[in-house]
Amino acid sequence: MPEETFEFTASRWTRGNLLFPVRIEVSRERVARIKPRLVGANEESIPISKVASVNITTGLIWAEIRIDSSGGSNPILSHGHRKADARRIRDLIEGFQTGR
């Protein structure tokens, strides 16, 4: 049975996302930030069980999301997401952590 993955793409109208917008992927197992490049991609991920907090900072239109791990490693940072998408990312992570 394939794992269900939710994907959220940052707006191309925000800094650093014009050609290759950042994607946040959330699944039952992990949350990942994927930054495509001309050749390949840069991916960082945190297991859902190790997510300590999700912080959302909203602006007029866009939101920035910060996902901290309980292991003390570098947080996942992403900007340029719609506010509704940022809240959905937080709700999915919290839901997967509680088993919903």
Q: Whereabouts are the PLM-identified features?
A:
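Acidic, Ser/Thr- and proline-rich intrinsically disordered linker/docking segments
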Residues: 1-18, 26, 32-33, 40-100
